[in-house]
């Protein structure tokens, strides 16, 4: 059986945690960690560029709230002016391949998410810790 000691009672800890303003911290943590994924997506997409339109369009949007909580989109946006094809559509073709054109899948999204997972979690934890320090919790 595990045993631990603490200087804070469970009631004090719960009171401190319930005073955390999730509405303020969640979007901030997401927006501060998004550039990590953005940089990796650009790095992995760079070798596959033809015109550079898709790679240049990779950006992080602002955090948004839905019924499930906060989320943030990092990826290609907009439309290629020359071809009229949406940049996210190009990224999907790259990720999954196109059978009709014998284009093999060369994933960039899944490897970017997997390789940045730990750094993103560390960044979000750091943001949370700074929030706690600044608010004396």
PLM-predicted stretches and their roles:
Residues 77, 81-96:
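A short, structured beta-strand/loop element
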């Amino acid at each position: 059986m595990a045993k631990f000691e603490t200087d804070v009672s469970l009631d004090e800890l719960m009171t401190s945690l319930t005073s955390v303003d999730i509405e303020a911290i969640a979007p901030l943590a997401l927006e501060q960690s998004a550039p990590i994924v953005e940089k990796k997506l650009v790095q992995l997409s760079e070798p596959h560029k033809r015109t550079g339109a898709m790679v240049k369009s990779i950006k992080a949007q602002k955090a948004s709230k839905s019924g499930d909580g906060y989320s943030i989109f990092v990826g290609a946006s907009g439309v290629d002016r020359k071809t009229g094809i949406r940049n996210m559509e190009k990224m999907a073709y790259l990720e999954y391949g196109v059978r009709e054109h014998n284009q093999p899948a060369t994933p960039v999204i899944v490897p970017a998410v997997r390789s940045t997972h730990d750094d993103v979690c560390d960044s979000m934890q750091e943001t949370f810790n700074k929030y706690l320090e600044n608010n004396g919790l």
